[in-house]
Amino acid sequence: MNAPLKLAIVEMAVCAFVAVILSGCASRDLTPAPNGPRVDLMSQSQYLHLIENNTQTKKVYDGFALLLEYRISFLNTPISLGQVDMNTQLYQYSDSQYQNEKGTTQSNLVKQTEFFLSLYIPDGKYDDLAKKNTKWKIFLDVAGQRYEAKAVRIKAQLRDVQNLYPFHDRFSTAYKLIFPVSTSITENGVAKLTLTGPMTS
């Protein structure tokens, strides 16, 4: 039979993350931008350190049976801008492409908060977070307000996803969780991310 599953997935003092992240940003390497002038790009090792320190992993069991496994990353300002740097080096962006991507990212940071979710559910019929008729609900509580997520399934090639999220594997589904609240608000408070939905029990 089916029973509702409610998980308080992430309850984190986001401001504590920022202290670690900002220290990493202060020591960025100067890397030549391909097809353009030198710009201050984050190195791969610095980016991997940031994403590792802002990712939480958990397995949920019913007895000995695995119900789901997730890895979730808070895409705060340093990580989001770091992803632009990583893509610039990987895909050989010109300086104008780099500036356009950076501008788009900065605009999104003002409008919304994003998380990356790598989700594995053995019973695949429940892996439908992005469908209109899904039973799953995802909430972000921050600054005394609750926001509901829009879940978007990432359809990029596995290797492209792993370039930014090396912990993601081919057995899991990649999602972007988008909340209509500025990233700066989430960064400067304590946020709780809650996932509720159906699950076999």
PLM region spans:
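Bacterial N-terminal signal peptides that target proteins for export
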Residues: 2-14
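Conserved functional micro-motifs across diverse proteins
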Residues: 26-201
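C-terminal motif of bacterial Sec signal peptides marking the signal peptidase cleavage site
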Residues: 21-24
